[in-house]
Amino acid sequence: MSDLLYTNGPVPYREDLFRVFHEAGIEVRFGVPAGDLRSEWERERPDRVFVPEFSAMALTALRSRKRFGFKVISLCDDSMDMICGNDFGWKHRLARRVIPHYLDGIILHSPDVRLWYQSRFGKGFFMPIIADERRVRPELERVLPLSRQIRPTEKPIIAFVGRFVGLKNIPALLRAFEPLRNRAQLVLIGDGPERPVLESMAPHALFTGFLFGDERLAWYNLIDILVLPSTQEAYGAVTGEALMAGAKVVVSRQAGSSDLVREGENGCLFDPMDEKGITDCLEKLLETLPSGRPVALRENLLPYRFETCIQDLLKEINLL
């Protein structure tokens, strides 16, 4: 059996998924021009073609399916918030109503979204957007000396990780943190057009800029609470990254990664329009943190394990 997966380019949060797909015989191809797809299919005669979302690639594959005899499976990042009307655009909303009818399968990151698709279209596989703990956990342990070296304070660290843009709703976090500034250190990891405004709002916060590789991993060992306050967020892979490192999370209900949160266990959910709700969540989680925490490898707080999920997904796909 021959399978081809197409994506527009390397996607860091899909790194482990694509690696295991490749090991399972699904060839991953990046940035193939739409005009070259049919010639590839003519030459290689795949049995299954994996496409991103409801993209032009998906439409090309569906139009060509009868000619080449392959099945079409989409990787879709829809969240329940998007399904309920908070979409990034009308084109995706329209495509969601039509294209799933014609797909042979669709891979979704949320159990609730999967149920929604199954109830309306009779199809849907589940695979959360998480990394492989067998790869990441040893790396977190390896960078512990760097974590200890760059630790800025003994106080608990509350952090945001991502782009400084409007949809991330960072000003709400800064205002919500204000009553807690004597109890914790706020760290903003990232950059973007809103940085000058944010720096003027929070002179007490630590701004690191974008971080990559070991330095980014080292900070995850230090973060006690990660906050994702977005008003619109298809997923938010940083939630899973933080939980895998043992940090607790405060996540907007409008983020797709809210599905990873188990309230009372690994985090707290809030309405991103309710700044007091953010403060309340932070206060609640601060009370649960041990005092004088050593910088050490912590328990993985993710509710799912990559190996279990990917093996279940491959079994379901192979039944098509």
Give short role names for the model-derived ranges.
Residues 263-264, 268-275, 283-289:
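Conserved acidic donor-binding segment of nucleotide-sugar-dependent glycosyltransferases
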Residues 72-89, 102-105:
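A short, histidine- and acid-enriched strand-loop-helix "catalytic/donor-clamping" loop
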Residues 97-145, 207:
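Donor nucleotide-sugar binding/catalytic pocket of nucleotide-sugar-dependent glycosyltransferases
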Residues 196-211:
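Nucleotide-activated donor-binding/catalytic signature segment of Leloir-type glycosyltransferases, i.e.
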Residues 147-168, 174-177:
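Conserved donor-binding/catalytic core segment of Leloir-type glycosyltransferases
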Residues 210-211, 218-223:
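Short alpha-helical donor nucleotide-sugar binding micro-motif in glycosyltransferases
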Residues 248-251:
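Short hydrophobic beta-strand element within catalytic cores of glycosyltransferases
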Residues 231:
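Aromatic "clamp/platform" in nucleotide-sugar-dependent glycosyltransferases that forms part
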